[in-house]
Amino acid sequence: MAHPPLSEFSLIDRFFARRATGPHARAALGIGDDCALLAPEPGKLLAVSTDMLVEGRHFLADVDPRALGHKTLAVNLSDLAAMGAAPRAFTLACALPRADADWLEAFSDGLFALAERHGCELIGGDTTSGPLNLCVTVFGDVACGAALRRNAARDGDDVWVSGTLGDARAGLGVIRGEWRAGEREAAAFRRALEWPQPRVALGVALAGIAHAALDVSDGLAGDLPHILERSNVRADVDVDAVPRSAALATLPADVQRRCMLEGGDDYELCFTAAPSARTAIDAAGARAGVAVTRIGTIRGLSAPTDARAVTWRDASGAPLSLTLHGFDHFHAN
């Protein structure tokens, strides 16, 4: 269907501004001025995060625009979840190679479906022409003293992860021809890659229960060490305890391990908590409808020179000799 040419401001109005406000609108001032205005709620802190998605680096050129709209916001909501913060509002800046009305309609559908599900209001942004590039800044709130931070892991804490790890990386591998999968499994992998589900309800439930947390965006092997470095501790992780999907279990063992430990784009939560919190964490996972799995233990350092690193172990506790790396934007194919 042919559409009349879109100007910058007609594009913003048609696909974004008209859908920006809804029943969850809480901004003092939203789209239409030079700035939006947000009033912090009493007793809460404002949590702010920004993520950029670039074609060819974070998503494929043939991605469904509806899925891309979803993922553009999802990866930012995942950061709020990792802090135990509830979503509140977001801004969107995008460079578009062309003003394609059908593409924009689908993209905004995916974006706003997720925004409405989590009560997150679009309050501003920017558009320009150029190679496809998307940037969201998200705002949330968390009670003072309850935020989950990377520097709060303690000696003796359990290490947990939500959901399963590795399906998104498995999907990328199938698309690239690195390995093969059955038709059903390949579809599940691609869905994990393109439709990540931010664990917002779980993150909010963990605030005040867990000690440290982050979202697994660059692979467990790349992300867990951030907690260890910031908290000045080390960790033992049972590789066999790391949760995997039934689809991932159909792939060769070495591929499973690579995807679970090194793969990115999982957007699950990795967090630590005292052993006394196990019942509360299981209950939080059940309320959020998300499986939670204990995979290891935080250990204190015996000496200041000890490595703040993960010791990967098998089910018997024996250390494994593994060379693992998380995703790095400047050292990735």
List each language-model region with its residue ranges.
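Glycine-/charge-enriched secondary-structure boundary and capping motifs
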Residues: 2-23, 64, 97-121, 128-134, ...
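Residue-level signal for inorganic ion chemistry
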Residues: 37, 76, 84, 122, ...
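Glycine-rich anion-binding loops of enzyme active sites
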Residues: 46, 53, 86-176, 297
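Internal active-site segments that recognize and position negatively charged phosphoryl groups
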Residues: 154, 158-163, 195-220, 224
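A short, charged helix-loop
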Residues: 181-197
